């Protein structure tokens, strides 16, 4: 009985939350519609840059094309 009441309250809360946030979503719809080449400063996106480690730092399991190393070559430490 308690679980049923909790589930009903949770569903009502999530439904109300959806309706409350729906108005604010309409104001932001243009932000996601733009392609990266249409944006003013698409090069400044943090997703365009990877945080790589310089030569001599620990990189983990050794293998070629390791994204952790700037040189993409890992032998427990990044090598050039």
Swiss-Prot record:
Keyword Secreted applies: yes
Leader sequence residues: 1-22
Cellular component, GO, one term: extracellular region
Tissues/organs with expression: Expressed by the venom duct.
Keywords for the protein's UniProt record, in alphabetical order: Calcium channel impairing toxin, Disulfide bond, Ion channel impairing toxin, Knottin, Neurotoxin, Presynaptic neurotoxin, Secreted, Signal, Toxin, Voltage-gated calcium channel impairing toxin
Short name of any one Pfam family annotated for the protein: Conotoxin
Molecular-function annotations in GO: calcium channel regulator activity; ion channel inhibitor activity; toxin activity
Propeptide part(s) removed at maturation, as residue ranges: 23-50
InterPro entries: Conotoxin, Conotoxin_omega-typ_CS
Disulphides: 52-70, 59-74, 69-78
Subcellular location: Secreted
Protein's job: Omega-conotoxins act at presynaptic membranes, they bind and block voltage-gated calcium channels (Cav).
Family (UniProt): Belongs to the conotoxin O1 superfamily.
Record text about domains: The presence of a 'disulfide through disulfide knot' structurally defines this protein as a knottin. The cysteine framework is VI/VII (C-C-CC-C-C).
Protein name (database record): Omega-conotoxin-like PuIA
Organism: Conus pulicarius (Flea-bitten cone)
């Amino acid at each position: 009985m308690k679980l049923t009441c909790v589930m009903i309250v949770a569903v009502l809360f999530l439904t109300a939350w959806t309706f409350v946030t729906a108005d604010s979503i309409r104001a932001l719809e243009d932000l996601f519609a733009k392609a990266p080449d249409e944006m003013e400063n698409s090069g400044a996106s943090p997703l365009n840059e990877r945080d790589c480690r310089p030569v001599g730092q620990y990189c983990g399991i050794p293998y070629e094309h390791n994204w952790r190393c700037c040189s993409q070559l890992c032998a427990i430490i990044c090598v050039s």
